[in-house]
Amino acid sequence: MSTAFVRRGANLLVTGGLAGVVVWIGARYGLLSWVAFIAWVACVFSGATGSAAAVALFAMLAGALSGCLVGWLTQPFTHVLGQFSLPLVLCLTVGLIALLEELPSMGLVPVYFLGMIAYFASGMPPGAAALVNIAIPAVLGIACGLLCPVARNWLEKRADLLLR
């Protein structure tokens, strides 16, 4: 068997296995499994190292908090601005997040938007419950993003030893 076949097989087993575990945990505990997959992508996008994953988790949760703030700020401005309150508040929030790209430590602007998307897609009202319902599967997804390359490398080495 070729090395490429072993690598693809290890990737299939590890990534597919972890994805199955995420879905099972989500169904078992009523978590938003799709948030874990978004966080997993954010972890891989950030480089899948411990410090980069921590920054990705922070950015994703900050994005979810930004989504909550949009929900909170839209309500009082609706009385004054009517149907234009949501677009204006969202425009200001997204614009401020986009400006973060200029700061070297805040370069994961797309991950902020992934967190905001996770909040809006959850359909939950703004509040702590929404943030907790996003934070728990986000941590699970970041853990999968960190574990996947480690487990894949471990499995590839074991397979290479068996095939020699």
Task: Give short role names for the model-derived ranges.
Residues 77-112, 164:
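Internal alpha-helical transmembrane segments of multi-pass membrane proteins
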Residues 33-71:
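Alpha-helical membrane segments and adjacent membrane-interface helices in multi-pass membrane proteins
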Residues 52-62, 104-113, 127-139, 156-162:
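A cytosolic-side transmembrane-helix exit/cap motif
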Residues 1-49, 127-134, 142-164:
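Alpha-helical transmembrane segments and their membrane-interface boundaries
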Residues 18-26, 66-77, 96-100, 121-122, ...:
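Alpha-helical membrane-inserting segments
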Residues 23-37, 74-91:
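Structural signature of hydrophobic alpha-helical transmembrane segments
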Residues 12, 16, 20, 60-64, ...:
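Alpha-helical transmembrane spans of integral membrane proteins, capturing the lipid-embedded, hydrophobic core
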Residues 30-48, 95-126:
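Pore- and pathway-forming membrane helices of multi-pass small-molecule/ion transporters and channels
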